[in-house]
Amino acid sequence: ATVYNNDGTQVDVGGRFDVALG
């Protein structure tokens, strides 16, 4: 899954779950 940190950086969490980091 592609998710975004609070600072707008993109994170790949392997598609297992979607989270908002930071």
Swiss-Prot record:
<keyword id="KW-0626">Porin</keyword>
<dbReference type="GO" id="GO:0006811">
    <property type="term" value="P:monoatomic ion transport"/>
</dbReference>
<keyword id="KW-1134">Transmembrane beta strand</keyword>
<keyword id="KW-0998">Cell outer membrane</keyword>
<keyword id="KW-1015">Disulfide bond</keyword>
<comment type="function">
    <text>Structural rigidity of the outer membrane of elementary bodies and porin forming, permitting diffusion of solutes through the intracellular reticulate body membrane.</text>
</comment>
<keyword id="KW-0812">Transmembrane</keyword>
<dbReference type="GO" id="GO:0009279">
    <property type="term" value="C:cell outer membrane"/>
</dbReference>
<dbReference type="GO" id="GO:0046930">
    <property type="term" value="C:pore complex"/>
</dbReference>
<comment type="subunit">
    <text>Disulfide bond interactions within and between MOMP molecules and other components form high molecular-weight oligomers.</text>
</comment>
<keyword id="KW-0472">Membrane</keyword>
<keyword id="KW-0406">Ion transport</keyword>
<dbReference type="GO" id="GO:0015288">
    <property type="term" value="F:porin activity"/>
</dbReference>
<keyword id="KW-0813">Transport</keyword>
<comment type="similarity">
    <text>Belongs to the Gram-negative porin family.</text>
</comment>
<protein>
    <recommendedName>
        <fullName>Major outer membrane protein</fullName>
    </recommendedName>
</protein>
